[in-house]
Structures are given as structure tokens and as C-alpha cells.
């Protein structure tokens, strides 16, 4: 069982174990040893978002990697998918992302991409942990003559802008569109506005003044109400909101209504079905996706394959099954024909291409899917336990499932990145399922302690 790595790398409060400079250096050393293969000069890319603690962790990782005889390529603030792309295009041995994605600025994280731009398998992360905790890495240092160097790649953002524009159809542009763009004061604050403006859109940018502590603060994909308000105030055609590392995206239509990842997947998948480009007529989603997505895909002649929650599991299923489109309700979307991981700006470009191709507004395209009412309640718990072993909780869940009569579902799972138990209900009546979700949350609080929040 892994001690450091969760579903999306190592994550925690900055300057508190495990997100300390000391641990970052050890992680860098272990990674460098693993990716060092053969006699050639090895290189690892390091990129980050805009958190204040990114400077500390970047320096520590760089020192650890160089101490093992591997060179470092520093790209500075860059979206997570940009780091995956640069790692692959520069033929580096690996890429490192310093980010806690949508979490508040106090948190930070470290995750890796392999040389081909995909997230690491569990086996590699376990090997990294074994090297760190066994102290074996201490005996593997190279000589002073063999230590690595660090180089800064000054044009990384420009390279990624060029790549992103290359995924947009050559016969289309964005002229005539007014877009509100919320970059969450995060990693895409320069890249995203440049992409949409260079393709011809009028862009109203918010969340583009990072100061190290305002990433995701009342902005970005977790706060679409900010973008929604700006769309209505400015008479924009749509709004696009990214999270702190720009690997996910949420939209609002011209009326300010939120269009989530499920509806965006439905729009893109059904268009790809019409074009004959959706491999095996299959979309990969997670168990959190609304049942309305399954219905929309079936109606269009396709199908949905479900995975555990986490974009890494979506990608694993896509690679295993030979599929080329997958994603999550939260707005992670993977277009494997273009990139190897979730990419908010790239996903937005695919939606904009459909709008421009068919001259339809986002509100019209969103009608492809009719979601079932869905309610999510989070309970913050001190530790994870098997809730079905608590008789009162198990009885409450079983009672709710009986009331749904097969016309909805109950899904309860622990977050992979936060100390939260997520209680999700779907059904035909939103009032009923909200009441039942709160009932389950209340009994969990009573029996296990904790604090519920909607």
C-alpha cells in the first residue's frame, strides 16, 4: 500500500509533511534514479502553478534531481497538460508538476508524467516510495563530476500556445465570439487568453492576476457563478472557467447557466459519432457521471464505459480499450487524439469548434443531454473507515435505495485527494434525493463524527 502517493500524486499542506522541502528533495532523488536509464544525459522537466510554495518545492526537487546526475528543465508556471506536452515533445525522461490543482493555495502537490506524457503507474510510485523510506537512495549518489545541471526553458508557454492552436480546425476561427475566460489566477493565466485571442475571439479575462495566494480563491471552475455574472453583464456568448492547473474546464452558456463536464462530454462525443471519429463508438466516464449521459449516448448510437473516479483511471481504461475520448463530470476531459491527459483549454477549443462549425449557441448544443437531478453532500471525516460496517449507516443507505425503486442510485465514496466522504444521489425528484442525501450525511456525522457540507 502506498504511503505518499494518492490518486493524483503526493498532496498536502505546503511546508507540512509530506509537502516539505526535505521530502520534495527525496522525491526528486528517487525519481531521478528511476528515470536514469543508460549512459546518455538524462533530463526531467519541472513545471508548476502559481502557488507561493511552488518556489520552495521547485528548488528542492531541482536539487534532488541534479544530485542524482540528471539535468532539470525548468518551464515555470504552465498548465499541467502543457508540462505533459513539453515532456513528450522535448523527449525528456519525465515531467514533474508542482500543483494541487483546484485546492486552495495552502495546499500543494507533486505528480509525475512519463516520457510519453502519461501519468505514472502505481508500480513506479511504489518503487519511488521504497527508495525513499528504505534510505537506499542515500547510497546511490553519483560523484561530484556527474551531478546534473538546471536549465530554464523561456519559451515553454509560447510552445504550448502553438500546440493548442494546432488542435483547432484550420478552416475555422473564433471571430464573432465574445468569451468570458476565468483562469483561476492559476497556471493558464497567460496561455489561455493568448490562445483564444490569437484565434480571433474577443476575450474578457478574469482570474489573470496571480499573487501566490489567490489561486482558486472565489474564481475558476469551482466558482462558476463569477463567470456567469460576467457573461450576463457583458452580453458574452459563453464563459469558460479553468482550475488552478488548467486540467479541467467548466462552461456557462449565454444565459449564465452552468454546463458541466457530463454535458460537454455528451456534446463532443455525439459530434464525434456523427463524424465517425469516436473510436468504437465509446465514451469513457466515471461512476460520478450522471445517468443522463448514458441515455444521451445510447440515443446517439454510442455507449459509455464507466471507471473509478480519477482522470488517471479514465486514461487507463482508454488505453486498455483503444478509446479516444473520456472525462469526468468535474470537467477533466481527455482527447487522446491530441494530448495524453486532461486539458481545459484544449477541451474548450473542441467545444468552440463545434459551435462555429454548426453556428449554434452553447445552450442549443447542451440540449443533447437531459441530466437526472443529482445531489452531492460531502462529510469531512478525520479518518477513512468502512461505513457499511456501521449497522445504522448501512440500514439508512439500504432504505434510501429501496425508496429510489431502481429509478436512481446512491453512490458513496471517499475522495482521493481530500479527507471527505462524498454522498451522491440521483433520482427523478430533486427534493426527495436532497432530503435523503442529508439523512445519510446526518447518520454518518452521528456515528463517525465529522462535518457535512453541500
UniProtKB/Swiss-Prot annotation:
MF (Gene Ontology): magnesium ion binding; phosphoglucosamine mutase activity; phosphomannomutase activity
Binding sites annotated in the UniProt record for Mg(2+): 101, 243, 245, 247
Taxonomic classification: Bacteria, Pseudomonadati, Thermodesulfobacteriota, Desulfuromonadia, Geobacterales
Residues annotated as catalytic: 101 (phosphoserine intermediate)
PTM annotation: Activated by phosphorylation.
EC number of this enzyme: 5.4.2.10
GO annotation, cellular component aspect: cytosol
CDD domains: GlmM (cd05802)
Organism field: Geobacter sp. (strain M21)
PANTHER family hit by this protein: PHOSPHOGLUCOMUTASE (ALPHA-D-GLUCOSE-1,6-BISPHOSPHATE-DEPENDENT), PHOSPHOHEXOSE MUTASE
Entry keyword Ligase: no
Protein name: Phosphoglucosamine mutase
PROSITE patterns recorded: PGM_PMM
Catalysed reactions listed for this entry: alpha-D-glucosamine 1-phosphate = D-glucosamine 6-phosphate
GO term, biological process aspect, one: UDP-N-acetylglucosamine biosynthetic process
Amino acid at each position: 500500500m502506498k504511503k505518499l502517493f494518492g490518486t493524483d500524486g503526493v498532496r498536502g499542506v505546503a511546508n507540512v509533511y509530506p509537502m516539505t522541502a526535505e521530502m520534495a528533495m527525496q522525491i526528486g532523488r528517487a525519481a531521478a534514479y528511476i528515470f536514469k536509464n543508460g549512459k546518455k544525459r538524462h533530463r526531467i522537466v519541472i513545471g508548476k502553478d502559481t502557488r507561493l510554495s511552488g518556489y520552495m518545492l521547485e528548488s528542492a526537487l531541482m536539487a534532488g534531481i541534479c544530485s542524482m546526475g540528471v539535468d532539470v528543465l525548468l518551464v515555470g508556471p504552465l498548465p499541467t497538460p502543457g508540462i505533459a506536452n513539453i515532456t513528450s515533445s522535448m523527449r525528456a525522461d519525465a515531467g514533474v508538476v508542482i500543483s494541487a490543482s483546484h485546492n486552495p493555495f495552502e495546499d500543494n502537490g507533486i505528480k509525475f508524467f512519463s516520457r510519453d506524457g502519461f501519468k505514472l503507474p502505481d508500480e513506479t510510485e511504489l518503487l519511488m516510495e521504497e527508495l525513499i523510506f528504505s534510505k537506499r537512495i542515500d547510497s546511490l549518489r553519483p560523484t561530484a563530476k556527474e551531478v546534473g545541471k538546471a536549465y530554464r526553458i523561456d519559451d515553454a508557454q509560447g510552445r504550448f500556445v502553438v500546440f493548442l492552436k494546432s488542435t483547432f480546425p484550420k478552416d475555422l476561427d473564433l471571430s464573432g465570439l465574445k468569451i468570458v475566460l476565468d483562469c483561476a489566477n492559476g497556471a493558464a493565466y497567460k496561455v489561455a487568453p493568448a490562445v483564444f485571442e490569437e484565434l480571433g475571439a474577443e476575450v474578457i479575462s478574469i482570474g489573470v492576476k496571480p499573487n501566490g495566494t489567490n489561486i482558486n480563491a472565489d474564481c475558476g471552475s469551482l466558482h462558476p457563478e463569477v463567470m456567469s455574472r460576467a457573461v450576463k453583464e457583458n452580453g458574452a456568448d459563453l464563459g469558460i472557467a479553468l482550475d488552478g492547473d488548467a486540467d479541467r474546464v467548466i462552461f456557462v452558456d449565454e444565459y449564465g447557466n452552468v454546463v458541466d463536464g457530463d454535458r460537454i462530454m455528451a456534446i463532443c462525443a455525439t459530434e464525434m459519432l456523427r463524424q465517425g471519429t469516436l473510436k468504437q463508438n465509446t465514451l469513457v466516464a466515471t461512476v460520478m457521471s450522471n445517468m443522463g449521459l448514458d441515455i444521451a449516448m445510447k440515443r446517439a448510437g454510442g455507449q459509455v464505459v464507466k471507471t473509478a473516479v480519477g482522470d488517471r483511471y479514465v486514461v487507463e481504461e482508454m488505453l486498455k480499450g483503444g478509446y479516444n475520448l473520456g472525462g469526468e463530470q468535474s470537467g477533466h476531459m481527455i482527447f487522446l487524439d491530441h494530448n495524453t491527459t486532461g486539458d481545459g483549454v484544449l477541451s474548450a477549443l473542441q467545444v468552440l469548434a463545434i459551435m462555429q462549425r454548426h453556428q449554434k449557441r452553447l445552450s442549443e448544443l447542451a440540449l443533447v443531454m437531459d441530466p437526472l437531478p443529482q445531489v452531492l453532500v460531502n462529510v469531512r471525516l478525520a479518518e477513512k473507515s468502512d461505513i457499511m460496517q456501521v449497522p445504522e449507516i448501512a440500514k439508512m443507505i439500504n432504505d434510501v435505495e429501496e425508496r429510489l425503486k431502481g429509478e436512481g442510485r446512491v453512490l458513496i465514496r471517499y475522495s482521493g485527494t481530500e479527507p471527505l466522504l462524498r454522498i451522491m444521489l440521483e433520482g427523478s425528484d430533486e427534493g426527495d434525493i436532497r432530503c435523503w442525501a442529508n439523512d445519510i450525511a446526518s447518520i454518518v456525522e452521528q456515528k463517525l463524527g465529522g462535518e457535512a457540507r453541500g
